[in-house]
Amino acid sequence: MDRYNFMKACKNIIIDYFNKHKDTTDKDIEMKIENVFVVWSCKTLQNNKTLLSTTMPDGLYYEITYNGDKHEAYVDVYKKWENFVVKEEDFDYEIKG
């Protein structure tokens, strides 16, 4: 599968997923292609992987991997809980536990 068709398929997978699984508070929202964007993408031999997100308020993040040998895609859906900074001077290099 070429990269362009893989990107289109991934965006459609996310649109279908969101529209079937959206929160009750988002029932009036319909996701469209312009709400989906690619964060990162890579093609190696017959395999593809892409990380995508959306402009939707749900905070979901998607990872889609295409297995070119089996002609199937695996979809992982993530929710970002928090983003915080740890400065290098605060790194703890001791193994705990």
Model-derived features: positions:
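N-terminal trafficking/processing presequences and adjacent post-cleavage segments
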Residues: 1-22
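Short non-domain terminal segments
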Residues: 4, 16, 35, 82, ...
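Amphipathic alpha-helical interaction segments
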Residues: 14, 25-26, 48, 89
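Transition segment at domain starts
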Residues: 15, 26-33, 40
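Amphipathic, interaction-prone secondary-structure segments
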Residues: 34-72
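Intrinsically disordered, low-complexity regulatory segments enriched in Ser/Thr/Pro
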Residues: 57-97
